[in-house]
Amino acid sequence: MVKLRLKRCGRKQRAVYRIVAIDVRSRREGRDLRKVGFYDPINNQTYLNVPAILYFLEKGAQPTATVHDILKKAGVFTELTLNQTKFT
């Protein structure tokens, strides 16, 4: 199973996080499948690769609670519902 979660980078006492798609069994600093974003909590900066995030969400990736809040604030889930079409 794949999750979208935060991977810690940066210096001591100055954390910066990458938002990555990673296997659920991997460690926090383990090998990721793809880097899909960036989050700096101190400067409150966020960069998201929305097409890559939508790709992983459509394939069944589960975001963690913190990543879910970041994506919700950026409006990614509204784009996800607009991209889904009903097949009859």
UniProtKB/Swiss-Prot annotation:
Keyword field: Chloroplast, Plastid, Ribonucleoprotein, Ribosomal protein
GO molecular function: structural constituent of ribosome
Chief place where the protein resides: plastid
Pfam families per UniProt: Ribosomal_S16
BP term (GO), one: translation
Protein location: Plastid, Chloroplast
GO CC, one annotated term: small ribosomal subunit
Tree of life domain: Eukaryota
SUPFAM superfamilies listed in its UniProt record: Ribosomal protein S16
Key word Ribonucleoprotein present: yes
InterPro entries found in the cross-reference section: Ribosomal_bS16 (IPR000307), Ribosomal_bS16_CS (IPR020592), Ribosomal_bS16_dom_sf (IPR023803)
HAMAP family given in the database record: Ribosomal_bS16
Membership in a protein family: Belongs to the bacterial ribosomal protein bS16 family.
PANTHER family in UniProt: 30S RIBOSOMAL PROTEIN S16, SMALL RIBOSOMAL SUBUNIT PROTEIN BS16M
Protein name as it appears in the record: Small ribosomal subunit protein bS16c
